[in-house]
């Protein structure tokens, strides 16, 4: 597994010197009073050296040294704005509206891109024209910026996602084509405080399969300002409501099966012993289920990027 990742990173360094025309990537960082980690976030982007990048930082009216940090990197980013907004997703909508890149993604102000992450993204979308959105290996980063956990490569399916398996798509590692963004409505919902990414993924799944990439792209930083246990409970509850509404859009046997499965999951949740058995048997079974929308994994081999079916 490690050898695959190392070969991928090396190949991107070679590609960087090859004169290849890279797709334009539009990346946005929303921030509010982010002085502790923002500089590391910006550096993880600009130090990539990706040659066709639109990078916008959107500040929500910070009162600490955030603006000073942004100004320090004015010459290395595409632009920035500072004004009050209606939450993170409103800030992201403002940022994306100022970009034209054909590939899109965002990076929160405490998180990091992995080395050559943008070259990985650009080369995949350039090589695999049928792929519309991707996510890298789920990765956790310590408060000091060290990668501390790299999870196995999940395979994604809309059916399993709506059933409750594979719930957490790591946003820091997720990128998509602008055409998919536009088909899905062209904006993030500002109705939510923390669940707007989940709601966007639900809309993306209506139009395209999500492909995992067996490579490191970005990482989520664990720190004191991350979601607390109580906030996580609210996040899960709101995501469950979003998924339930999406299931209602379906028809026939698929809708009936998903509703029954979700009902059973809720019914056993208050019973610890039964819940444990359900999670071991039913939920693990979902992870291994090959649905019709089960997406191949993207891997790098001797001849470049390929889909492993």
Identify the role of each PLM range:
Residues 104:
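Short aromatic/hydrophobic "clamp" motif used to bind/position activated sugar donors
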């Amino acid at each position: 597994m490690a050898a695959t990742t190392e070969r991928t990173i090396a190949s991107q360094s070679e590609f960087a010197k090859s004169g290849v025309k890279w797709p334009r990537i539009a990346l946005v960082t929303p921030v509010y009073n982010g002085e502790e980690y923002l500089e590391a976030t910006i550096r993880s982007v600009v130090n990539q050296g990706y040659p066709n990048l639109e990078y916008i930082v959107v500040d929500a009216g910070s009162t600490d040294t955030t603006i000073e940090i942004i100004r320090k990197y004015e010459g290395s980013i595409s632009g920035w704005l500072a004004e009050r907004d209606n939450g993170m997703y409103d800030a992201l909508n403002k940022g994306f509206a100022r970009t034209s890149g054909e590939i899109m993604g965002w990076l929160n102000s405490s998180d990091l891109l992995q080395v050559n992450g943008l070259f990985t993204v650009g080369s995949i979308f350039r090589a695999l024209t049928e792929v519309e959105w991707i996510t890298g290996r789920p990765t956790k980063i310590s408060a000091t910026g060290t990668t501390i956990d790299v999870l196995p490569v999940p395979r994604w399916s809309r059916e399993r996602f709506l059933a409750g398996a594979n719930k957490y798509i790591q946003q820091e590692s997720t990128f998509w084509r602008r055409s998919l963004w536009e088909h899905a409505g062209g904006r993030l919902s500002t109705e939510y405080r923390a669940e707007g990414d989940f709601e966007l993924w639900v809309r993306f799944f209506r139009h395209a399969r999500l492909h995992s990439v067996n490579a490191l792209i970005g990482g989520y930083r664990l720190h004191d300002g991350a979601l607390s246990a109580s906030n996580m409970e609210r996040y899960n509850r709101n995501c469950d409501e979003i998924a339930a509404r999406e299931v209602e859009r379906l028809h026939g046997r698929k809708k009936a099966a998903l509703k029954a499965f979700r009902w059973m999951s809720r019914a056993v949740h208050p019973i610890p012993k039964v819940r444990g058995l359900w999670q071991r048997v039913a939920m693990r079974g979902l992870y291994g289920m090959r649905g019709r929308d089960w997406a191949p994994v993207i891997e790098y081999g001797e001849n470049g990027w390929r889909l492993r079916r």
